């Protein structure tokens, strides 16, 4: 989260006559350790964990160990303090609602659509699907600190149309007003062999890109029932 520029002032200052200022694309990254609390109990043992190394902190997940990256926490730092990796405690947490709202006030932003986070890029099908529910619960709890100002975007998988419809209905009941779908429908076969899983994981961005060469594509009439549910629920979609 960037340091706010206080020169912009407040959108609610006297004399402002153009209505609320709405930021249509802010980003929120959940804390790395939130999965242990928000995944279904049956999946929590598989959640990512933070390991404190001598040089930096590491995120350990499914046999991989990667450093905590600081690249999105450089705004406002002096050049001499620039660093690519570091510790969780050094990050300016985008998930702190008080800091988020204070920055919005300084920038004159009244309300915001909040993208980011989403499911785990997992090799495990059950964990992958469960992470959609876990993220939805976390981000809605986070937004509940200012529900009139923070509007989180939900996530839904797109491997099977009926499966997606069930996720959309669940998100609507939770209060989401916008849902992000993968850019292309996903290949449901990708979870069945180790080679396909490897291709799926390396080719997806946050498990949300999909398969542009797949047999199922959004323009096909099979998707009409999904579009109808989205309209009936008053849900806006984004890709």
List the model feature ranges, each with a label:
Residues 1-239:
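Helix-coil boundary/capping segments in enzymes
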């Amino acid at each position: 989260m960037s340091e706010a520029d206080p020169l912009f002032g407040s959108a609610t200052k006297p004399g402002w006559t153009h209505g609320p200022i709405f930021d249509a694309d802010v980003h929120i990254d959940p804390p790395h350790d939130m999965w242990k609390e928000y995944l279904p109990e049956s999946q929590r043992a598989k959640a990512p964990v933070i390991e404190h190394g001598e040089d930096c902190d590491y995120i350990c997940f499914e046999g991989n160990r990667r450093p905590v990256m600081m690249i999105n926490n450089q705004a406002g730092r002096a050049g001499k303090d620039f660093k690519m990796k570091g510790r969780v405690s050094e990050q300016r947490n985008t998930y702190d609602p008080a800091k988020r709202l204070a920055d919005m006030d300084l920038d004159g932003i009244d309300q915001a659509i909040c993208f980011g986070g989403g499911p785990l890029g997992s090799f495990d099908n059950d964990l992958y699907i469960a992470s959609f529910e876990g993220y939805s619960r976390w981000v809605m709890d986070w937004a509940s600190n200012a529900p009139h100002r923070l509007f989180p975007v939900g996530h839904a998988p797109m491997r099977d149309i009926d499966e997606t419809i069930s996720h959309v209905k669940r998100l609507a009941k939770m209060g989401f007003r916008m849902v992000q779908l993968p850019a292309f429908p996903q290949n449901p076969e990708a979870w069945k062999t180790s080679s396909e899983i490897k291709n799926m994981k390396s080719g997806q961005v946050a498990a949300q890109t999909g398969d542009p060469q797949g047999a199922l594509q959004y323009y096909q009439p099979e998707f009409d029932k999904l579009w109808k549910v989205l309209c009936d629920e008053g849900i806006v979609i984004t890709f």
